[in-house]
Amino acid sequence: MTVRVSVRSRKLRRFEVTALPFAVRVYINNQVLVPASLVRALGIAHLRFADVDLEYKGFVIELRGVRLLRTRHTDARQFTIPKRVRETYGVGFGDVVRILSIRPSITNKDKD
């Protein structure tokens, strides 16, 4: 008697993002998720602070020195859109913003 057992991987593949620009929704806590695949592709897993360029309703918004928040078990990062920017441009939760670029901030050099 032969028994065949199917073994499935526990690893879920949601989506692979490896290049910018990237469109993403703003969470209810005013944070934006940068997927782990994009973090690895850009080589920014070691960064604590970054300069981020966003596009929202035709406006290009430059955020300097935003803190990249991380979880314990993944390479994904999140950052909060500052209140001043949210109020000025009307960015709210559920809105779609495009991440145009993410680059190391000068703040990284000061903190190490």
Task: Label every model-predicted segment.
Residues 32, 59-63, 79-81, 106-108:
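Generic recognition of long tandem-repeat/solenoid scaffolds
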Residues 13-62:
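Acidic (E/D-rich), amphipathic helical modules within compact regulatory domains
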Residues 16-23, 67-70, 76:
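Short, compositionally biased strand/turn segments
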Residues 60-71, 101-102:
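Short domain-boundary/entry signatures in modular proteins, especially
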Residues 28-43, 73-89:
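Short beta-strand-centered segments at strand-helix junctions
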Residues 43-59, 90-107:
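A short beta-strand-loop micro-motif that forms or neighbors metal/cofactor-
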Residues 1-18, 87, 98-106, 110:
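Short linear interaction segments
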Residues 34, 65-67, 75, 93, ...:
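Exposed regions on extracellular, virion, or secretory-pathway luminal proteins
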